UniProtKB/Swiss-Prot annotation:
The active site is at C64, H206, D218. This is Cysteine protease IpaJ. Coiled coil: none annotated. Disruption phenotype: Mutants are not compromised in their ability to invade cultured epithelial cells or to form plaques on BHK cell monolayers. Keywords: Host cytoplasm, Hydrolase, Plasmid, Protease, Secreted, Virulence. It comes from Shigella flexneri.
């Protein structure tokens, strides 16, 4: 795994405040997205036949958390999704967990906090961002367990200072928060938050999928990569202004206890 870029100390607090506008929200600059409305069901069949890991390009600007969770759940053997009120699965009467727009949309409604019909937005593209507690909620609805890792660094400290409710929300739902991630087992996947840098300046945060073998899936590109550094290279190829990803020390470990 490549060496992580160290954030510039100058103005780091200001940068942290700016980043918190998209706190773990899965937000990534619009110009970085290659395509928004992408259905990859055909691609799913191809990668499954090859026995490879799954990849999914996010449908919406801020749905990287949902797209990453969808791939993680499929790789961990989940094949059903709840037909909750207002979901596309309910409307189509389908309960299979597929690598398609229906399932990403249904998960995104949960991870963005728009699953409640009273606050449901007419335009899902404007639904908002995937927050840690809502990702954990969606993970549990899929029958999986999750805990949050919050390593001690400038990013996590700024986030905790500006958004103290984040920890309380997780604790309130009985989600464990630890300060160090253990070695992953084959029945685990990780949704990892990274800072996105353009022209050397952190401009947003983004969720990516990490696996026990060290490989990654970047939903902004919709591709799998052997390691963190090759994922950065893939992102650079998609946008000449992109500089890199920086790990911020916050991640969600997802486990299928049945495996």
């Amino acid at each position: 795994m490549s060496e992580q870029r160290k954030p510039c100390k100058r103005g780091c607090i200001h940068t942290g405040v700016m980043l918190y506008g998209v706190l773990l929200q899965g937000a990534i600059p619009r110009e970085y997205m290659i395509s928004h409305q992408t259905d990859v069901r055909v691609n799913e069949n191809r990668v499954n036949e090859q026995g490879c890991f799954l990849a999914r390009k996010q449908m919406y600007d801020n749905s990287c958390g949902a797209a990453s969770l969808l791939c993680a759940a499929k790789e961990l053997g989940v094949d059903k999704i709840p037909q909750y009120k207002g979901s596309m699965s309910e409307m189509t009467r389908k309960s299979s967990l597929d690598l398609d727009n229906r399932c990403e949309r249904d998960l995104y409604l949960i991870t963005s906090g728009n699953y409640n019909p009273r606050i449901h937005k007419d335009n899902i593209a404007d639904a908002g961002y995937s927050m840690p507690d809502k990702i954990v909620m969606a993970t549990r609805l899929l029958g999986l367990n999750a805990y949050v890792v919050e390593e001690s660094n400038i990013f996590s400290q700024v986030i905790s200072f500006i958004y103290p409710d984040a920890r309380d929300l997780l604790i309130g739902m009985g989600c464990n928060i630890v300060h160090q991630r253990d070695v992953l087992s084959s029945n685990q996947r990780v949704l990892e938050a990274v800072a996105v840098s353009f022209i050397g300046v952190p401009v947003g945060l983004h969720w990516v999928l990490c696996r026990p073998d060290g490989s990654y899936m970047d939903p902004a590109v919709g591709e799998n990569y052997s390691c963190f550094s090759t994922m950065e290279l893939g992102a650079r190829r998609s946008n000449s202004n992109f500089i890199g990803y920086t790990k911020i020390g916050i991640s969600i470990v997802i486990t299928n206890e049945a495996l």
